């Protein structure tokens, strides 16, 4: 049929072009142009996001919006001053527009449930879709044929609908509004449209069922998938053809993808597609709605993103669209849903369009996803893209958008391709379509998905081959989709993400993937089936399934898809995959699915998916994540399955095939991959590798890949670029896959991570992560995975990052060696053993890939990558290592892990980077940048998402992260985002499920890991190992580790940060926990165990210890920073991003306060962080003051009284807090004025002195401006302290102690003299009932030799001193030993090469 429809599509395309031209005749008016994609050639635009970019035609509002109707506005966020609202809360305030019930009520409420419900139906829908598929294409065609314009209009409507639906509509609001507007305007068609819309809506509903075809696809995520599938199916030929064409287009597509959403508008074909899509979407929407709901939450963010993205997309679309649109349109129809996304995308692409179409769908999905994810992804993507750079931009779509166009092209192709990959994923369906051509196309779609774009981007290149990926991805997506369906559960979650995402993406993906693939191939049925399956599984698994399916599917599918037959395979695979996944899913089911899927998906997707997956995954994950499933799933499945399922899924499919080869690889990958992927490129590599492999695999392997794909897919997806590597990639693939799997596995861990992830993810920051990865990885693996993501993110950027990561990884690499071990470990997890071997190999492969990846990542990465690569492998290894380590980490690290993630990522990355960096740095830098971007983006996105989603997302994020991780990897962002998301959920869920399953497996695995590596156990040791490993890396490693550790935290933080932060704070504990969690992630049990550990560690204090060890272990250098972060886990994290430096206590900046707690712990405070210092290990990871101490930061100063109680006082502005060790006393804060006899002014440092003979206990307040005031405590009877504080040998005692001691003794005489002075104080003893505040005097008057600028001061317990203390004051980079009795201060000169931070903080 596809072939038959091809001509039609072509005709449609022609007509579309014509129409487009026609419609473009009057470019200064929106008449007939409402919702059309963005075009740089137009003087003004009418896409639904034009307002965001202030590029709307003057009559846009009049022509394209309806003030009193909810048509297309269901997902827009609330805005003041409107006559009526259509957001989910309007009912609460009784301000809903009159037609709210008919347009949005269902979406907002039932949706959720429906979602679930629907989700399942989607299965049915899928079937329907199947029909639909056929039908869809037709209608679209018909429609399209009818009139592009009309179509367009319709599309618009649909678009609107869809948009609205999509709302993911991210555009949602924008779109919605726009849509609404457009609708209204729509040409006056508004009415018609309205009717139509209503009709559509009904149709949608009905259609969904009925049209289901289109809708169904949409409908369920599966629908979406279907949709994708559908059109995909239809599209297939066209698509394929187009795809092929598109392929090229892809480039464009990519851009388009962005458009995707907008694409919708593009309409024409989009329209048709849209219709379908819409329907689909609608359904989806419903489902999606749930999603939406979810999405809605997301919405905001999504919206934003969406909007942005949409706009971008739209814009892109528009411009792209136009042509593309047309083209697309035709194909689109097929894709219809896809179109939508794709359309846009396609449009751009034109040919791609078709493919795009899928994209469309995807887009759509993506959009939502994007949106949702988008936010995550998009944003992320951007970053990711960034990574991809081109893509990213594009991805950013929003950013890209604009960029896209250009970018797109440029990128597009790649992007598309790449994207495709992702898209593919999404596209997958497309892929099917794609199948072969599709692939390209697919990519395109992918692009749309793009969101995935980012990934896609990567993939895109891959794209062609990607297709497989795509498929794969889609699969993931699909799963996702299904997930969505399943999501159902997730739905909400999923929905949100998934749904939208999923649906959109997933659906598309799934469907698409499967569908497309299948359908296309098996054609619809299959598709349907596939989708269904996917979906189905999804439903079943629902989350799980979907996810799983997704993954597996994706993998499989993907794989298949590419293959086409594959497709069927996909289907089957898919199915199986799903099944497996499902299985996993079942296990986790939810979890699993996600997990599996996610993981895998992510994995698969991840890479590709990443984008998509990411999206999807993210979405799903996200969703899922929330679901955790993913996480869980991953965790669980992953773990268990994870290995099996997840792995399974991915692995399975992947593994299976891949497995064999890959498998090991995967395994390895997993181990390695994770490691590698994770680590190395982890992200990049991963990605790249994966990608490459993937690609290659897919492409070549594709088939094989399929298997691999799955793994590969992920990989593939992931890497398209890898494509190049492709070959290697395959190998890589495995890794990738593995990775993925690994990831997955890792993921699992990742999940853990995710959970942790969140942290980790944040960690993600992957870059760091990578670095961390190793360490983290282990733990991290999950983390790593996550990490990966981070890396991923970086990955993309990362690639570069990757490299860095890799670098990191390299460090890891160093580890690498270990890695193998680790891998083993990791592998253990998966193949564990083999993995190791393989992994190792893979790793290499990866590296290899990485290079490709790098390529992909392109060169930047590449260059780096190479290193990375090497590293990568190493990294991989490291990763593994890391993983193990992580494990350990996890254990210990757990926190660290988290931290690690976190920090590393952000901070570390940089930092790490730094260390590693340098190499990495470059990379990193890039990465960072990228990362940053990504992270940033991510963060942003994440944040957004996070925010919105946050809770959900968080979970998701995590998941995503995981996914992301995987995915992210591709996108860092996503990851982040994901992470963020996931974490939350993940954590929870994950923990749970994971725990269970994960635990088990993981545990097992882990244990295995552990055992294997010991790592887990060892982890810690591992750490060391790692360290060594790292060390191997050399310092870097160290850093890495350190990073890792921090990374965990940091990153997450970072990304998470946002989220975490959010969460973190709350989470902090959680974070810690989470961190722990992350570890958790890894093994839940472990987690638990870890957790505990972590927790302990996590616990601030406990954490410290734990941390300390761990951090110290490798933290030295970075540690500070990282440690810092880790310490803070969440907190630190945040900073992390930029902070790298802020969280690095060893950067030479003076601290705000340094004190010893009553229990002898030496604590340094600077900015928003604090570090626990130990004489024998590097500083702990930075932790947030606010999260642990509960006081606002930064503080002005801190001091601990030199008496038996040893209370610690914090000063901030005009208030002070009193703590007993780290427990805040009741009744604080209190005004400084009242507590210290009228003390006022800006306090910069405080030195507490002990009571000795006639000297009263007092405290000297150094104030801004060089003055000092002494406050003498009310005198109390002399008492012997029952158990004196523990005598600790502080680092500073090393060198100057003796001299000081002699000095002190010599000074005793004067002391007495002083005593007399002080006698004054004694005189004051009269005021025994209260303390006395002396007048302000210049510092130099009170103490000779002390500079006017004192930044901090400390009383160190020293049992060898007469009064039991040594007193020090710090001024910039110099410190002084203060002799209280003689009132003199002597500057301490450190031995050559020693710095103040080395002496005091034991910095490396």
Swiss-Prot record:
Disulphide connectivity of cysteines: 30-34, 30-46, 34-64, 44-46, 44-57, 50-56, 57-64, 70-74, 70-86, 74-104, 84-86, 84-97, 90-96, 97-104, 1146-1403
Tissue: Highly expressed in synovial tissue, cartilage and liver and weakly in heart and lung. Isoform B is expressed in kidney, lung, liver, heart and brain. Isoform C and isoform D are widely expressed.
Domain spans labelled SMB: 26-69, 66-108
Sequence repeats: 348-355, 356-363, 364-371, 372-378, 379-386, 387-393, 394-401, 402-409, 410-417, 418-425, 426-432, 433-440, 441-448, 449-456, 457-464, 465-471, 472-479, 480-487, 488-495, 496-503, 504-511, 512-519, 520-527, 528-534, 535-542, 543-549, 550-557, 558-565, 566-573, 574-581, 582-589, 590-597, 598-605, 606-613, 614-621, 622-629, 638-645, 662-669, 678-685, 686-693, 694-701, 702-709, 710-717, 718-725, 731-738, 739-746, 747-754, 755-762, 763-770, 771-778, 779-786, 787-794, 800-807, 808-815, 816-823, 824-831, 832-839, 840-847, 848-855
Basic and acidic residues bias: start-end ranges: 193-205, 915-926, 999-1012
Any one annotated GO CC term: collagen-containing extracellular matrix
Hemopexin repeats: 1148-1191, 1192-1239
Signal peptide start and end residues: 1-24
Record PTM: N-glycosylated.
Glycosylation sites noted in the Swiss-Prot or TrEMBL record: 123, 136, 206, 240, 253, 277, 291, 305-306, 310, 317, 324, 332, 338, 367, 373, 376, 384-385, 388, 391, 399-400, 407-408, 415, 423, 427, 430, 438-439, 446-447, 454-455, 477-478, 485, 493-494, 501-502, 509, 525, 529, 532, 540-541, 553, 555, 563-564, 571-572, 579-580, 587-588, 595, 603-604, 611-612, 616, 619, 627, 676, 683-684, 691-692, 699-700, 704, 707, 723-724, 736, 768-769, 776-777, 792-793, 805, 812, 829, 837-838, 892, 900, 930-931, 962-963, 968, 975, 978-980, 1039, 1159, 1161
Keyword Glycoprotein tagged: yes
Ranges of Basic residues composition bias in the record: 132-146, 1026-1047
Region (Disordered) residue spans: 111-966, 992-1104
GO molecular function terms noted in the UniProt entry: polysaccharide binding; scavenger receptor activity
Keyword vocabulary terms for this entry: Disulfide bond, Glycoprotein, Proteoglycan, Repeat, Secreted, Signal
InterPro entries: Heme_transport/Cell_adhesion (IPR051298), Hemopexin-like_dom (IPR000585), Hemopexin-like_dom_sf (IPR036375), Hemopexin-like_repeat (IPR018487), Hemopexin_CS (IPR018486), SMB_chordata (IPR020436), Somatomedin_B-like_dom_sf (IPR036024), Somatomedin_B_dom (IPR001212)
Polar residues compositional bias, start-end: 235-252, 266-276, 1073-1085
Compartment annotation: Secreted
Region annotation (59 X 8 AA repeats of K-X-P-X-P-T-T-X) ranges: 348-855
Biased composition (Low complexity): 166-177, 329-348, 356-405, 413-431, 523-561, 612-636, 700-721, 728-761, 777-790, 797-830, 854-866, 899-914, 927-966, 1048-1060
Compositional bias annotation for Pro residues: 432-467, 476-506, 562-592, 602-611, 653-667, 677-699, 762-776, 831-853
Function text: Plays a role in boundary lubrication within articulating joints. Prevents protein deposition onto cartilage from synovial fluid by controlling adhesion-dependent synovial growth and inhibiting the adhesion of synovial cells to the cartilage surface.
More about this protein: Different forms varying in molecular weight have been observed. Such forms are possibly due to different levels of glycosylation and protein cleavage.
Disease: Camptodactyly-arthropathy-coxa vara-pericarditis syndrome: An autosomal recessive disorder characterized by the association of congenital or early-onset camptodactyly and non-inflammatory arthropathy with synovial hyperplasia. Individuals with CACP have normal appearing joints at birth but with advancing age develop joint failure, non-inflammatory synoviocyte hyperplasia and subintimal fibrosis of the synovial capsule. Some patients also manifest progressive coxa vara deformity and/or non-inflammatory pericardial or pleural effusions.
PANTHER family tied to this protein: HEMOPEXIN DOMAIN-CONTAINING PROTEIN, PROTEOGLYCAN 4
Protein name (database record): Proteoglycan 4
Source organism of the structure: Homo sapiens
């Amino acid at each position: 049929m596809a072939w038959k429809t091809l001509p039609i599509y072509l005709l449609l395309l022609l007509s579309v072009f014509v129409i487009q031209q026609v419609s473009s005749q009057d470019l200064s008016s929106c008449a007939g142009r409402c919702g059309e994609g963005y075009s740089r050639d137009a003087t003004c635009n009418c896409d639904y996001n034009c307002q965001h970019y202030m590029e709307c035609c003057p009559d846009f509002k009049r022509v394209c919006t309806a003030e009193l109707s909810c048509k297309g506005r269901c997902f827009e966020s609330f805005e003041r001053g409107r006559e009526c609202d259509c957001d989910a809360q309007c009912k609460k305030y009784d301000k809903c527009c009159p037609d709210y019930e008919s347009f949005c009520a269902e979406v907002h409420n039932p949706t959720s449930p429906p979602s679930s419900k629907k989700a399942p139906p989607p299965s049915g829908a899928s079937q329907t879709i199947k029909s639909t598929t056929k039908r869809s294409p037709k209608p679209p065609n018909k429609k399209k044929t009818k009139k592009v314009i009309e179509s367009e209009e319709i599309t618009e409507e649909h678009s609107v609908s869809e948009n609205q639906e999509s709302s993911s509509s991210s555009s949602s609001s924008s779109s919605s509004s726009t849509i609404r507007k457009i609708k209204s305007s729509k040409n006056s068609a508004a009415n018609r449209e309205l009717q139509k819309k209503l009709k559509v809506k009904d149709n949608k509903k009905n259609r969904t069922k009925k049209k289901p075809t289109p809708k169904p696809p949409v409908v369920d995520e599966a629908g979406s998938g279907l949709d994708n599938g559908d059109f995909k199916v239809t599209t297939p030929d066209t698509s394929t053809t187009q795809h092929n064409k598109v392929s090229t287009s892809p480039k464009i597509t990519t851009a388009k993808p962005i458009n995707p959403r907008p694409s919708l508008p593009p309409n024409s074909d989009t329209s048709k597609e849209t219709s379908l899509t819409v329907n689909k979407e609608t359904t989806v929407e419903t489902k999606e709605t749930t999603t939406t709901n979810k999405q809605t939450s997301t919405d905001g963010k999504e919206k934003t993103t969406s909007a942005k993205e949409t706009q971008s997309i739209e814009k892109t679309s528009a411009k792209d669209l136009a042509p593309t649109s047309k083209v697309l349109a035709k194909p689109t129809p097929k894709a219809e849903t896809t179109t939508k996304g794709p359309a846009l995308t396609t449009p751009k692409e034109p040919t791609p369009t078709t493919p795009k179409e899928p994209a469309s769908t995807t887009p759509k999905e993506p959009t939502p996803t994007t949106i949702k994810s988008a936010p995550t992804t998009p944003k992320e993507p951007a970053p990711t893209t960034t990574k991809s750079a081109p893509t990213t931009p594009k991805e950013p779509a929003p950013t890209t958008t604009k960029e896209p166009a250009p970018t797109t092209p440029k990128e597009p192709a790649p992007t598309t391709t790449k994207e495709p990959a992702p898209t593919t994923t999404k596209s997958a369906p497309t892929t099917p379509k794609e199948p072969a051509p599709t692939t390209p196309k697919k990519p395109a779609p992918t692009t749309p998905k793009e969101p995935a774009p980012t990934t896609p981007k990567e993939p895109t290149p891959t794209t062609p081959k990607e297709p497989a990926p795509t498929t794969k991805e889609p699969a993931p997506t699909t799963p996702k989709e299904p997930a969505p369906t399943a999501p159902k559960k997730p739905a909400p979650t999923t929905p949100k993400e998934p749904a939208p995402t999923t649906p959109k993406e997933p659906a598309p993906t799934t469907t698409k993937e499967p569908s497309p693939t299948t359908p296309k191939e098996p054609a619809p049925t299959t598709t349907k089936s596939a989708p269904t399956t996917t979906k189905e599984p999804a439903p079943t698994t629902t989350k799980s399934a979907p996810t799983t399916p997704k993954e597996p599917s994706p993998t499989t599918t993907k794989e298949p898809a590419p293959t086409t037959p594959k497709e069927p395979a996909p289907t089957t695979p898919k199915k199986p995959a799903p099944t497996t996944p499902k299985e996993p899913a079942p296990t986790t089911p939810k979890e699993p699915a996600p997990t599996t899927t996610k993981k895998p998906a992510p994995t698969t997707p991840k890479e590709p998916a990443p984008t998509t997956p990411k999206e999807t995954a993210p979405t799903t994950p996200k969703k899922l994540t929330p679901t955790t499933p993913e996480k869980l799933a991953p965790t669980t499945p992953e773990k268990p399955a994870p290995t099996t399922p997840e792995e399974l899924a991915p692995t399975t499919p992947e593994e299976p095939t891949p497995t064999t080869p890959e498998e090991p690889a995967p395994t390895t990958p997993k181990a390695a991959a994770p490691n590698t992927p994770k680590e190395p490129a982890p992200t990049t590599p991963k990605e790249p590798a994966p990608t490459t492999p993937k690609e290659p695999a897919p492409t070549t392997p594709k088939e094989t890949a399929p298997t691999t794909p799955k793994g590969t897919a992920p990989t593939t997806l992931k890497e398209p670029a890898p494509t190049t590597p492709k070959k290697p990639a395959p190998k890589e693939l495995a890794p990738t896959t593995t990775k993925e799997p690994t990831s997955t596995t890792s993921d699992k861990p990742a999940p853990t991570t995710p959970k942790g992830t969140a942290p980790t993810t944040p960690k993600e920051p992957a870059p760091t992560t990578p670095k961390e990865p190793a360490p983290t990885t282990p733990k991290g693996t999950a983390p790593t995975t996550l990490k990966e993501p981070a890396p991923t993110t970086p990955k993309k950027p990362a690639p570069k990052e990757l490299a860095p990561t890799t670098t990191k990884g390299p460090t890891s690499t160093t580890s690498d060696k270990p890695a193998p071990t680790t891998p083993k470990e990791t592998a253990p997890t998966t193949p564990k053993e083999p993995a190791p071997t393989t992994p190792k190999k893979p790793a290499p492969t990866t590296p290899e890939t990485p290079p490709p990846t790098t390529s992909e990542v392109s060169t930047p990465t590449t260059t780096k990558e190479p290193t990375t690569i090497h590293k990568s492998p190493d990294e991989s290894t490291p990763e593994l290592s890391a993983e193990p380590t992580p494990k350990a980490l996890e254990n210990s690290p757990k926190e660290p892990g988290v931290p690690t993630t976190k920090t590393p990522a952000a901070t570390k990355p940089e930092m790490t980077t730094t260390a590693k960096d340098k190499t990495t740095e470059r990379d990193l830098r890039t990465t960072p940048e990228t990362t940053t971007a990504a992270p940033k983006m991510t963060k942003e996105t994440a944040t957004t998402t996070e925010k919105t989603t946050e809770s959900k997302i968080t979970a998701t994020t995590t998941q995503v992260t995981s996914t992301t991780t995987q995915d992210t990897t591709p996108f860092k962002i996503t990851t982040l985002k994901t992470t963020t998301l996931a974490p939350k959920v993940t954590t929870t869920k994950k923990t749970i499920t994971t725990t269970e399953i994960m635990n088990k497996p993981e545990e097992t695995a882990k244990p295995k890991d552990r055992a294997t590596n010991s790592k887990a156990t060892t982890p810690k040791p591992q750490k060391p190992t790692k360290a060594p490993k790292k060390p191997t890396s050399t310092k870097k490693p160290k850093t890495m580790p350190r990073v890792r550790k921090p990374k965990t935290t940091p990153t997450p933080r970072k990304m998470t940060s946002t989220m975490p932060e959010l969460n973190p704070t709350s989470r902090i504990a959680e974070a810690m926990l989470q961190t722990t969690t992350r570890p958790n992630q890894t093994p839940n049990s472990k987690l638990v165990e870890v957790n505990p550990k972590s927790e302990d560690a996590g616990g601030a204090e406990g954490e410290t210890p734990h941390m300390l060890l761990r951090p110290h272990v490798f933290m030295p250098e970075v540690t500070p920073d990282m440690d810092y972060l880790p310490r803070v886990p969440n907190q630190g994290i945040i900073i992390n991003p930029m902070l790298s430096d802020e969280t690095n206590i060893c950067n030479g900046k003076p601290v705000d306060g340094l004190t010893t707690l009553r229990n002898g712990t030496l604590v340094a405070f600077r900015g928003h962080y604090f570090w626990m210092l130990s004489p024998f290990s590097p500083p702990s990871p930075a932790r947030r003051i606010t999260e642990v101490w509960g006081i606002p930061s930064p503080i002005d100063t801190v001091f601990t009284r030199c008496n038996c109680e040893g209370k610690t006082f914090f000063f901030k502005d005009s208030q002070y807090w009193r703590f007993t060790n780290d427990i805040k006393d009741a009744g604080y804060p209190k005004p400084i004025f009242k507590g210290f006899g009228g003390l006022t002014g800006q306090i910069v440092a405080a030195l507490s002195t002990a009571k000795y003979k006639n000297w009263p206990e007092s405290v000297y307040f150094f104030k801004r401006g060089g003055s000092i005031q002494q406050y003498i405590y009310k005198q109390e009877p002399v008492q012997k302290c029952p158990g004196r504080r523990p005598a600790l040998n502080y680092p500073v005692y090393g060198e100057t102690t003796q001299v000081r001691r002699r000095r002190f003794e010599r000074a005793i005489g004067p002391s007495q003299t002083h005593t007399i002075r002080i006698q004054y104080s004694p005189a004051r003893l009269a005021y025994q009932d209260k303390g006395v505040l002396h007048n302000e005097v210049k510092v130099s008057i009170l103490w000779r030799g002390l500079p006017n600028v004192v930044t901090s001061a400390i009383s160190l317990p020293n049992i060898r001193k007469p009064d039991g203390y040594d007193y020090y004051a710090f001024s910039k980079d110099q410190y002084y030993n203060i002799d209280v009795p003689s009132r003199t201060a002597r500057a301490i000169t450190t031995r050559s090469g020693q710095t103040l931070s080395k002496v005091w903080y034991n910095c490396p």
